[in-house]
């Protein structure tokens, strides 16, 4: 039973990442352990940032796990690609995860 649980958790995370890899956004993939799902949008991305925010704002929003409480979400956003918040804009996020993490920003703990 325990092994089955581990398999289900792995499969959920893998499916989530694969769905994002075929999304309309195009940017280089980094280490998988740095990816997570936003709680409110359910969208898999590495460091999601809204255009115009400062680095400190992004860090604050993600540590609080309430980015949608602070930033209006209309389906348009920018995703960080390589380096320290270098921004590439995406048109939409059309693929979603089935689960959300228990913690945000660089964890693999799934609820």
UniProtKB/Swiss-Prot annotation:
A motif (RxLR) lies at residues 28-31. It comes from the Eukaryota. One of its GO terms (cellular component) is extracellular region. Its main location: secreted. Keywords: Host nucleus, Secreted, Signal, Virulence. It is found in: Secreted; Host nucleus. Residues 1-17 form the signal peptide. Secreted effector that acts as an elicitor that induces cell death in host plant cells. Belongs to the RxLR effector family. Has the canonical translocation RxLR motif, but lacks the canonical EER motif, which characterizes most oomycete effectors identified so far. This is Secreted RxLR effector protein 82. It comes from Plasmopara viticola. The gene is RXLR82.
């Amino acid at each position: 039973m325990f092994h089955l649980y581990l398999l289900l958790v792995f499969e959920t995370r893998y499916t989530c990442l694969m769905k994002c890899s075929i999304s309309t956004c195009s940017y280089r993939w980094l280490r998988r352990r740095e990816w997570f799902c936003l709680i409110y949008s359910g969208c898999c991305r590495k460091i999601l940032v809204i255009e115009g925010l400062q680095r400190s704002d992004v860090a604050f929003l993600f540590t609080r796990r309430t980015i949608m409480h602070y930033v209006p979400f209309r389906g348009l956003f920018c995703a960080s690609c390589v380096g320290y918040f270098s921004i590439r804009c995406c048109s939409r996020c059309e693929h979603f995860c089935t689960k959300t993490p228990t913690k945000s920003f660089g964890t693999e703990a799934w609820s």
